[in-house]
Regions:
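Glycine- and Gly-Pro-enriched alpha-helical subdomains that act as flexible
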Residues: 174-182, 186, 191
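N-terminal lobe of the biotin/lipoate ligase/transferase fold
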Residues: 2-166, 188
Length: 192
């Protein structure tokens, strides 16, 4: 069962009894409890109490595939049919690298709500909170030598920071070489 469905059935700042939530989601209470505690572990703000049930402490902002597709209609670089939106995946990067048609690799994007094995720089594991981060990978093939893309991570970071600063306002910074920071937290990381 997608966890998104479970969260959509859970009210914001209002208790729902576990039995009622289990019925809404067609889950037994043990499975429901397991899913809720996994969501809490992954950073979703859920209140829980044995006698009162559960509630969302704040609204959850889901990735809207339809909205992304509409936005991509105007894009000359990425076509909507090359976009894949998943609730959960091991790694968006791995997903793209294992795409069956390598000839169709260029210009493909994978967006997810959660990665179980996200990758950071130097092969380090990267973990983002479920439903709080934009986790995506974009496949782009270069016709030039790989040594010409040395500064690409920094260039992409600057471009992303420039766009995000329109919404974020003051306080947005680029931390060498590939992290975009805001209010003392990491807003984005660029991995090339």
């Amino acid at each position: 069962m997608p966890l998104r469905h479970l969260l959509k059935q859970m009210p914001i700042a209002e208790w729902i009894m576990a039995a009622d939530l289990a019925q809404r989601t067609n889950l037994d209470q043990r499975t429901l409890d397991h899913h809720v505690h996994a969501l809490i572990k992954d950073g979703v703000a859920i209140g829980c109490c044995k006698r009162r049930g559960y509630y969302l402490s704040e609204a959850v902002d889901f990735v809207d595939q339809g909205e992304l597709i509409n936005m991509l209609k105007a894009s000359p670089l990425l076509r909507s049919e090359r976009l894949e939106v998943l609730d959960e995946v091991d790694s968006t990067n791995t997903r793209l690298l294992t795409w069956p048609e390598l000839s169709g690799f260029h210009g493909r994007a994978c967006v997810t709500e959660f990665q179980t094995a996200g990758r950071g720089r130097h092969g380090k594991r990267w973990h983002g909170a479920r439903y709080r981060n934009i986790m995506l990978s974009l496949a782009w093939q270069w016709s030039r030598s790989s040594d010409l893309v040395t500064g690409l991570s920094l260039s992409v970071g600057l471009a992303v920071a420039r766009v995000l600063s329109q919404w974020a306002g003051p306080g947005l910074q680029l931390k060498w070489p590939n992290d975009i920071m805001f209010s003392e937290g990491k807003l984005a990381g660029i991995l090339v």
